[in-house]
Amino acid sequence: MKVPFSWLKEFVDIDVTAQELEEKLFSCGFEVEELIPLDAGISKVVVGKIVEMEKQEGTHLTKCVVDCGAYGHEIRISTGAANMKLGDCVPTALDGSTLPGGITIKARKMQGVESNGMLCSGAELGLNDDLFPGSEVYGLLILPEDSVPGTDIAPVVGLDDYIFDISITANRPDCQSVLGIAREVAAVLGKPLHMPAMDYKAVCEPDAPITVKVEAPELCPRYMAHYVRNIRMGESPRWMKRHLALCGLRSISNVVDITNHTLLEMGQPMHAFDLNKVAGRTIDVRRAHEGEKIVTLDEKEFTLNPNNLVICDAEKPVALAGIMGGANSGMDDNTTSLLFECATFARDSVRKTSRALGQNSDSSARYEKGVDRYSPQLGLARALHLIQQLDCGDITTLEYDLTDGRPLERKHIVATPAKICGVLGITVPDQTMIDILQRLEFTVDVQADGSWDVSAPLYREDVESFPDLAEEVIREYGYDHIVPTFLNTASVTNGGLNYDQKQQLKTKRLLAAQGFYEASTLAFYSNAELDMLHIPAEDEARKAIRILNPISENLSIMRTLLTPSMLNVIVDNLKKGNAEGRLFEMAPVYLAKELPINEHPHERQTLCIGAFGPEEDFFTVKGALEALAAGFGLTFDYQRETAAWLHPGISAAVYCNGKRLGVFGKLANEINAELEIAKEQKDSQNIYLGELDYEALMSCVEGELRYKPLSPYAPVKRDLALVCGEAVSCGEIEETIRKASPLVSEVKLFDIYRGANLGDGKKSMAFSLSLSDPKKEVSAEEVERVVKKILGNLKFKLGIEIR
C-alpha cells in the first residue's frame, strides 16, 4: 500500500526524516518494501527566471538568458517551446544535470548556437496536472511568479516528498489506509494523532422516500447509507488531486474523487448510486439469483449465482457487493441525487466472489483482508464532511444504519502484567506497558487484585486475548530487548539431519549420480490429469480429495499419484525444445480412506522417476532402480505387471523382500499419441515413467549399509544361453539363478534372441554369471556343480533348456 509522507504529516507532527521513519515502522512490524523519493533521478534542476528572449533566425528555437541565482545570472539556453514570456520562472536543467529516466543534460550547440542547459516541461520532471497544475501543458512548466531563482526545483513543484510502499499483513486490516498507518506512526513517535474532520450538517429534507434493506445480514453485518441531493459535479481541489495522484489514482470529478479519497484515507470502500437510475428508489442487499447478470463499471458482464452477494434495486443487481458497482447505476454529468453507501461485507464472501468471477478492485482487496464494523461510520462521516466542504451537494436528513443486531462495543481482555511478560520471556515495567497500550488507543483499567481490564479499540478486531496484548507491547517496546535464553528444562541437541532426512538425501544423490535432475511440482492437479493417464474410474487413484475453494479448476484436487505431474513436466520440456532428460521427484501423495473425508488422509511419501529422449529405453529406468537398490544394500525383483498408463509389453513391477514397491515402464502408445506435442516428437520420443512407494522401500532397509570387503580371489565367469517361453521374464530367471548357490555374486543379461530355429513362442536369453568365494578360489568342480544345479532348477521351475 502506498502512503505519501506529506499526507502522514497532516495526521502526525513528524519530527524525523522519511528514512528514520522507515526504520521505526519496520521495528514495530511494518515492512516498508520501498521508500520512493519523488525527485528520484533529478539533480541540478533549479528555478530559472527568463530575463532575455530572442527568436533564433531560420529556426523554431528561442534564445533565452536565464537568471538561476547562485548558479549564474546570465545562463544562455535555447528552447523549442513557445508558451513562455519575459519574466516567467521555469524549471532549468543546468549543464551536468539529470532527469528521470537516466537522461543527462550537457551543454551543446543547437542550430549553431551554444545552449548551456535545458528549460523543462512538467512531463520531463515526471509531473502531471494532478501533482502540479500546468504540468501537462504543451511547452514549458510555468512556475509561480514568486519563485526564487536558483532554488532547487523539488520543493517548488512538490517533489520534496516520499512514498512509503508498505506491506500490510493479513492480521492488520485496520492499517489499509493512511489513517491506519498514521495511528502507528503517532504511537511509535509518541505524538498525538490529529483525526481528519468528520463533522457535517444536514441542510435539507429528502424529496422522495428511499427503501434500504439487507436480506443477508450474515454476509453484510453493517450497511450505512446517506442521501445527498442537488449534486454539483465539478473539479476537485488541488490538495485532493495531489493526494490521489501520490497514491496512483487520477482525478475524475469532485464526487468520484471523494469516494476514492475516503477509501485511501479512511480505508473504507464507498460507492455512490445515482438514484435517477435506481429502479423503485430501492436498495436491497441480498444473494444473487441463479443466472442473474450484471455489467460492472469496467463494462464486463458476469453471470451470478446465490454464492454471490449483490446490491440490487427493485428490478436488477446494481453492484457486486464489496467489489465494483454496476454500469447501470454509476454517476455521470446528469447525476442530481446520490445515495452514498458504506458497509462491512464478510471477507470470505467477497474473496470467493472475486476469485470465482476473476474480478478484483481496490475495494475487494480491502474487504478480503477485513473491514471492521466501526469503519463505515467513520468513512461515511468523512465523505459527507468533504461533500459539504467542497460544496458538491446538499446533505439531507435521510440516513440508514442497518446491522446484524450485534452491539458495537470494545473487546475486553482480562490479563495480568505477569501473563504478558510470561509470553515475552522478559520483564517489562508495568507503567511502560500501560503507556504503550494507551498510545495504541487501548484503555487499561487496573483492578484491585492487580489484574488489568484492557479494552481494544473498535477497529482492532484482530485482538482476542492477552498474547495479542503481549505482541502490541513488544513491537513498540522493541524486539531488541528480547535476550535469547534456554528454558530451564530444555535439552541442547546438535543440529543436523535426522535419519529420514539422511535417507532422502542419499536417495536423491544416488539418482543424481545416474544423471537425474530433481523436479518439484504442485501438490494439486485436476481430474484431467488422471484422465490423461487413462486411470479407470474404479482405481484407488480416483479417490482424490477435492479442494473446497480451489484457485482454479486446474488445481482442484490433491494428488494421488506423482506420475501425472511428471508427465506434464516432460511435455513442457518437449514443447520448449528440450528433447531429452532424466527427472525424479520425491513428494507426498494424499490418500483418503473414504470420500468425503472424515479424518486426515495418509500422506504417503512417493518416488517418481521419468526419462525421455530418443536414446532412452526400459533399461535406463531399470538401471537407475538397480543403482538405488545397490546404494541401500537391497535386491530388487521384477515381475511382469503393468499400469493403465504403461505399455503392457514394456513394463514391470518392482518387488523387494516380497513387498510390491511400484511399477515402471514405457508410456502407453495411445497416451503418447494424445500428448500435445509435435508429431515428429511423438514419433521419435521414448518416454519412460516409474512410481514407487518410498515408505515401503525404506521399510526394506535394515540399518546402515556396512562395508563388505571384496574377495581377494578372482571371480570365475560363465555364460549361459537359455531357451525359454516368451512368457518367462528376465526377473524370474535371475531370481532362480541367484537362489541356486551363494557363490553366484553377479548375474547380467547381455543378449536376447528370437528366431525360427528356436520354435514358435520361444526366445533365447544369454546371461553372464560371476562366481566367487571371499575365503578361497572357486574350483572348476565347484563351478560345474553350481552350473548343473542352476540348469536343473531352471528346467524344473521354468521349463528352460540350455541352448
Task: Label each residue range with its predicted role.
Residues 2, 20, 27, 439-442, ...:
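A carboxyl-terminal module marker
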Residues 33, 47-78, 242, 246, ...:
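Conserved mixed alpha/beta core segments that line enzyme active sites in large multi-domain catalysts
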Residues 39-43, 200-202, 455, 491-492, ...:
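Beta-rich nucleic-acid/ligand-interaction surfaces
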